[in-house]
Structures are given as C-alpha cells and as structure tokens.
Amino acid sequence: MKVERIKAIALDKKNAQQYAKTIACQQIGQPVKKVKYLGGGSFGRAYKIVFQNDEKIVVKFLRANDMLEKETHDLDLLAANCPVKIPKVLFSRKADNEVSVDCYGMELIEGSNAIFSLGLLLSSKRKRKQFADEVTTALQSIHSCKNDKFGDTLCSTYNRWLDFYKPYAEQILVKAEERFSKGELPKKVIEIMRAAWEKFDIIFSEEVTEACLIHGDFNIANMMIDKKHKLSGFIDPLNSMYADREYDLFQFDNLTGKRFFLRQTYVEKYGASKLCDIKCAFYGLYHEVYSYIKSGMLVGFIMNPLVKNMKKRLAEL
C-alpha cells in the first residue's frame, strides 16, 4: 500500500446529489423520489436513494483515484464470508465527462450507526456484552476466510506477514518524519513512533501463521444497529487484507469501543497471541498516522489515546 498524501477530487455537494439521482435512475431503471446525504470521510461521499416504488439503495462517490476496484472487490469478498449483512455492490461506474469521480451503488443497510446510539451506549452491561458477542462471532467468520499468502486482497504475494507489514510500517515512519520536520506532526507522536519502532522485532517476535481476511477498519462507527439496538450490518472496510487477524482488533478500543468489551470478548472466545496488547497498540498508532498522512487530518481525540496507550505498553515490555 502506498503511503502518501492524496488530494481529494473536488465534488460539490449539490452537484453530487443530482449526480446520485441521475446515476441511480440510469442504473436501476426506476424514477427517484428522494435523495439524502448520508455522510462521508476524506475521500468518500454517500447518498441514500429512495425510488418511487420505495426501494432504497446507496450511491457512493469516491474522491480519489484507484479506489473503485478495491472497494467493490472487498465489499463482495467480505459479504461472502460474513453472517452479518455487508452491503452488496449493485453497480459501479468510472468517472467520465458527465461525472468527474468514480462511484458505485450498493444495498442500503437499514438502521443507524452504533456510535451515535445513546440507547446502546447506556444499555445494561448484559446487553452490551450481548452486542459484543454478536460482533465478534461475525468477525471470526470473516477471519475464518484464509489465504496461502499475505497482502492486499487484490494481490497477496507474501509468504510471511512481516515481509508485508514491516516495510509498510517503515514507510509510515519515514513519511511521518518528513511531516515532523515540516512542523506538521506533533513531537509527542513522532517520539512514540520512534520508540515503538526501536522495539519492533520484540513486539512482533511471535510468528503469524495464518493469513486471515480482515475488514481493516473494524470500529464502532462502522457497525450498524436496528431500532432494538441489535446488530444489523457492517460498513466501510478500509485496506482489507489477508493479514494477522489481530490487526482487526486495535479498532475495538477506539471511540466508544471499550464500553462494549469488544476486544476482551474476542480474545476470551478465540484467543490471542501473548503480545496482542502491544501489537494492537503499534497497529493502532501507525494506522492513525497513515490516515493522517493520506488525508492531512489529525484527529486529536483518536490520536492522543493511541499515543498514551503505546507509551503504557512499551513500559510494560
């Protein structure tokens, strides 16, 4: 995976809404009754489409090049290996003279994002643990899809996990040093990255023997729930790979994830390596810096706990 700043392609929200309506009508062959903006990150923008017959889909625009094949491939692959709903890709469309960005249509998962549900957040410990049980059972199903090589789902060629991951992590550190030298990255972040890198061979001393399919961005914000606070689906994979399955676990501690005992539940049910805690600390820190390098956005309420956790885990070595 390339570690570099990506400039988002301009896409006016008003124009995008009209594009979504036109494309949905063309691709599905039904008149559109309503279009609603659902949200988006640095490089995506999603719209809910309601047709006259009340069927609903989502059209997602990709504001960076070379994302379309990867995203649609990974959604289909994950959906085929997960008992919980992951949106089925309905169509894809490359950028052209009419629409300046790539896009695709997919199924709508009804419900709401788990991170915004106060009802779920404040529910009893029993219900939160039940939610964790449902999530981790589904994740283990994804992880049960294995490959004979490690690496990107589109091209996995590595015999060992670290043959893929160590050069990738080193790229992140090199780019982070460049950003720090320009005064763009806080000193506390680069210092803890350096300290963690010095201990890399210890942190990753346990051999990863299985190349497991991972979601890549498995945090509470990418879990959907229904009106009864039951798990209804997963969305937005990022850089899905055949990888160390524990790479999917660091996101469980981000945002409000700890409230649901997600990582604890997974480890209790399926086990983990002896160094899982410090590996997840490393994965989490370097992933967040990677996201910053790509987008230029440093999210303090995510980054600061990752820095603190990495310091704690290094002190425990």
Per-segment meaning from a language model:
Residues 4-14, 63:
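A short, highly charged nucleic-acid-interacting micro-segment common to nuclease
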Residues 12-31, 125-133, 141-216, 226, ...:
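An alpha-helical support segment within catalytic cores of ATP-dependent transferases
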Residues 30-35, 186-190, 272-280:
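Short, surface-exposed acidic
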Residues 40, 133, 250-317:
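Helix-rich C-terminal or lid/interface subdomains of diverse kinases
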Residues 58-62, 90-91, 154, 213-216, ...:
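Short beta-strand segments
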Residues 210-214, 219-278:
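Active-site Asp-x-Gly
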